[in-house]
Regions:
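N-terminal regions immediately upstream of nucleotidyltransferase
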Residues: 1-69, 80-90
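Terminal (often C-terminal) interaction modules
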Residues: 1-10, 234-319
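Conserved catalytic core of two-metal-ion nucleotidyltransferases
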Residues: 19, 23, 36-39, 44, ...
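Soluble non-cytosolic domains of exported or imported proteins
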Residues: 23-27, 89-93, 166-170, 189
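Long, highly charged amphipathic alpha-helices
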Residues: 27, 31-35, 94-102, 174, ...
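Glycine- and aspartate-rich repeat motifs characteristic of hemolysin/RTX-like Ca2+-binding segments
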Residues: 73
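Short beta-strand-to-loop capping motifs
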Residues: 76-80, 203
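Catalytic cores of NTP-dependent nucleotidyl/adenyl transfer enzymes across multiple folds
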Residues: 100, 113-235, 312-319
Length: 319
């Protein structure tokens, strides 16, 4: 059987954000934080606090496919409201306008006032989402533009996933990234948070073999969804993220997962690394590296064996 673990490790490198992109994101984030603090101060309001959250904080962000944008979440936590009755909190539409006014003009594109955040779009191919929160009595409330203040705890989800990685293995983080890259390339109707939960709850460690860990994890996800097509958020408000999915959507997701599982089986059972990698390229795209044809690999092995220094006997001659 071909050993394609090293190909998966190279794939992980190719889908991971570069240091340059990471630094650019941090610079943009810090600039927005500065503008928001200044706007709040200039308008007689307590300066908010911030929390890096989402896939960037969990180190599971992947480079997007084609011209798609990648994004980060930076939570804006309003100060001065924790001791108030929630009925006295400002309207969610009001706090959205505050943050939008603070960041307008920071980029050429207008910021977008979405239901759950203010989105700032950058010409470099990424955007920063700014969800707004109030924390009270160990609960965190999100400013949803149409639903009002709703319970949502992104920090708890981040901590949940980080603990999952600690309890299991760093391999889990890589598998989440592989599956995110897969769903982007194959246009599978799953969100990043859903993939993160499914992979974490069904993770099968296989030390030194990401391809086998991924195969077993995908099979476990399939078994779980065929038993009950649910994906509960592990932190408040503990909702089923698959609520309302149509039968067709569920079938499409399961069929895509089964196709991935078959490709992994074929790749793992294949003797030729090049053929094995082609199965994976069909699922992950051209960012997955090509393996070396078996005859070339064997020739290199034979050459290395032939040109290896001989074992010396006690008299100094080659054995």
């Amino acid at each position: 059987m071909a050993d394609i673990h090293n190909l998966f490790m190279s794939f992980n490198d190719s889908i991971t954000l570069s240091d340059a992109k990471t630094n650019s994101l941090r610079t943009s984030r810090n600039s927005l934080r500065k503008e928001i603090k200044e706007w709040f101060g200039d308008n007689g309001k307590q300066k908010p606090k911030f929390c890096w959250q989402g896939s960037f904080a969990m180190k599971t962000t992947v480079n997007p496919v084609g011209g798609s944008e990648y994004d980060i979440d930076d939570g804006v936590y309003l100060s001065g409201y924790s001791e108030m009755d929630s009925s006295d909190w400002p309207a969610t539409t009001t706090v959205h306008n505050w943050v939008k006014n603070a960041v307008d003009g920071q980029t050429k594109a207008d910021s977008i006032n979405k239901d759950t955040c203010i989105r700032v779009v950058y010409a470099s191919g990424y955007h920063i989402d700014l969800p707004i929160y109030i924390e009270q009595n160990d609960s965190i409330y999100l400013a949803h533009k149409s639903k009002g203040w709703v319970i949502s705890d992104p920090k708890a989800f981040r901590d949940w996933f980080i603990q999952k990685v600690k309890d299991n293995d760093e391999q889990l983080r890589r598998l989440v990234k592989y599956l995110k890259a897969w769903k982007d390339y194959k246009a599978v109707s799953l969100k990043g948070i859903e993939i993160t939960i499914l992979a974490s709850n069904n993770f099968c460690v296989y030390e030194g073999h990401d391809e086998k860990s991924l195969r077993d994890t995908v099979q476990s996800i399939i078994d779980s969804l065929e038993n009950s097509f649910i994906c509960y958020k592990p932190v408040a408000p503990y909702e089923n993220l698959f609520e309302g999915f149509s039968k067709t959507k569920k079938e499409n997701i399961l069929n895509s997962l089964k196709s991935l599982k078959r490709a992994l089986d074929n790749a793992i059972n294949e003797e030729d690394p090049l053929t094995a990698s082609n199965y994976m390229i069909n699922e992950f795209g051209s960012r997955f590296p090509k393996g070396e044809a078996l005859d070339q690999a064997e020739a290199k092995t034979a050459y290395a064996r032939t040109n290896a220094p001989g074992v010396l006997k006690h008299d100094g001659r080659s054995a």
